[in-house]
């Protein structure tokens, strides 16, 4: 029984598209993509920005980094507080062995921002004097 994989068989190979057909399909897909992007912009509104995958990853990294800094600060404060009276290495290690942490974090700890304001258009940097002198 045939597998029906769509790849065709040796007797009836699948027809390969010509470069013209591929170019036509590409134009069609680009037009469809443009229409979908404009429809998405209408749906989202002017005050919001559609995230690209790269921008989303940058925002995730920014939030994780900020929350990690906040957690590290809380942990350090707790360790310093608990080991304040330790005067020897053994005392310090005994206190550390008994510590248990529960860190409370929230997005508000970051000041309420996941990223910089991407709505502002950034200006290109000017040419450096050093590079200008070389040319």
From Swiss-Prot:
Signal peptide: none annotated. It comes from the Viruses. The gene is 52. InterPro entries: Herpes_BLRF2. Belongs to the herpesviridae BLRF2 family. This is Gene 52 protein. Residues 1-20, 110-135 are annotated as: Disordered. It comes from Equine herpesvirus 2 (strain 86/87). It holds the Pfam family Herpes_BLRF2. Residues 122-135 have a biased composition (Basic residues).
């Amino acid at each position: 029984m045939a597998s029906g994989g769509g790849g065709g068989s040796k007797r009836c190979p699948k027809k390969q598209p010509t470069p013209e057909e591929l170019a036509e399909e590409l134009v069609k897909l680009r037009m469809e993509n443009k229409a979908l992007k404009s429809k998405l912009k209408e749906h989202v509104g002017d005050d919001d920005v559609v995230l690209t995958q790269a921008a989303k990853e940058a925002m995730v990294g920014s939030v994780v980094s900020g929350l990690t800094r906040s957690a590290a600060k809380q942990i350090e404060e707790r360790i310093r507080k608990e080991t304040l009276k330790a005067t020897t290495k053994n005392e310090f290690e005994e206190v550390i062995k008994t510590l248990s942490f529960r860190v409370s974090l929230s997005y508000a700890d970051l000041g309420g921002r996941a990223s910089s304001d991407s709505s502002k258009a950034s200006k290109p940097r000017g040419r450096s004097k050093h590079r200008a002198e070389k040319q």
